């Protein structure tokens, strides 16, 4: 809980600044920063290593990202380092993306199906989810053969499970209680 609250606070502060400056640009840079940290072990080592001094970390990060990140994002990273909050970077980026989506009236729908959906099925599902939520929908599709058939949709905390696997599970439960 503490990690989420800390990430929320920092993400909210950066978001408010980004709305004033350049929301799309700052969001893209933050994602670029996260991707670099996740994919480059040396960058992650410098950023997270407890025995590298704060000033060394800031100097190295500023050198690495000098031409890549705006002053705003570099200053934000320096703030995280100064406050020893760099371990929250990935969670902050996740919360920031959610805040940016909310500001743009976008909702993410995770759609899992046993086989890939046809283009027609995707379009119908997209339209129905947009109608249900009243928002623009970004679908993240996943194929999971263990679902047997049907579709499972997750939007935020809400899950709609119309899979064959779920229906079979409910039948098993009702038979075992009978």
UniProtKB/Swiss-Prot annotation:
The keyword Ion transport applies. It holds the Pfam family OSCP. NCBIfam families: ATP_synt_delta, PRK05758.2-2, PRK05758.2-4. F-type ATPases have 2 components, F(1) - the catalytic core - and F(0) - the membrane proton channel. F(1) has five subunits: alpha(3), beta(3), gamma(1), delta(1), epsilon(1). F(0) has three main subunits: a(1), b(2) and c(10-14). The alpha and beta chains form an alternating ring which encloses part of the gamma chain. F(1) is attached to F(0) by a central stalk formed by the gamma and epsilon chains, while a peripheral stalk is formed by the delta and b chains. Keywords: ATP synthesis, Cell membrane, CF(1), Hydrogen ion transport, Ion transport, Membrane, Transport. One of its GO terms (molecular function) is proton-transporting ATP synthase activity, rotational mechanism. Signal peptide: none annotated. GO terms for cellular component: plasma membrane; proton-transporting ATP synthase complex. This is ATP synthase subunit delta. F(1)F(0) ATP synthase produces ATP from ADP in the presence of a proton or sodium gradient. F-type ATPases consist of two structural domains, F(1) containing the extramembraneous catalytic core and F(0) containing the membrane proton channel, linked together by a central stalk and a peripheral stalk. During catalysis, ATP synthesis in the catalytic domain of F(1) is coupled via a rotary mechanism of the central stalk subunits to proton translocation. This protein is part of the stalk that links CF(0) to CF(1). It either transmits conformational changes from CF(0) to CF(1) or is implicated in proton conduction. It is a peripheral membrane protein. It is found in: Cell membrane. Belongs to the ATPase delta chain family. Coiled coil: none annotated.
């Amino acid at each position: 809980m503490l990690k989420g609250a800390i990430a929320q606070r920092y993400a909210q502060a950066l978001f408010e600044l980004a709305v004033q400056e350049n929301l799309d640009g700052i969001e893209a840079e933050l994602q670029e920063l996260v991707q670099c940290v996740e994919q480059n072990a040396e960058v992650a080592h410098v950023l997270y290593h407890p025995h590298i001094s704060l000033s060394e970390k800031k100097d190295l990060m500023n050198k690495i990202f000098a031409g890549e990140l705006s002053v705003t994002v570099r200053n934000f990273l320096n703030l995280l380092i100064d406050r020893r909050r760099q371990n929250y970077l990935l969670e902050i980026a996740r919360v920031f993306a959610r805040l940016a989506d909310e500001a743009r009236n976008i909702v993410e729908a995770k759609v899992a199906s046993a086989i890939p959906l046809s283009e027609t099925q995707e379009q119908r599902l997209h339209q129905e989810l947009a109608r249900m939520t009243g928002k623009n929908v970004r679908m993240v599709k996943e194929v999971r053969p263990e679902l047997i058939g049907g579709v499972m949709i997750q939007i935020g905390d809400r899950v709609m499970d119309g899979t064959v696997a779920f229906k079979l599970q409910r039948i098993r439960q009702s038979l075992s209680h009978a």
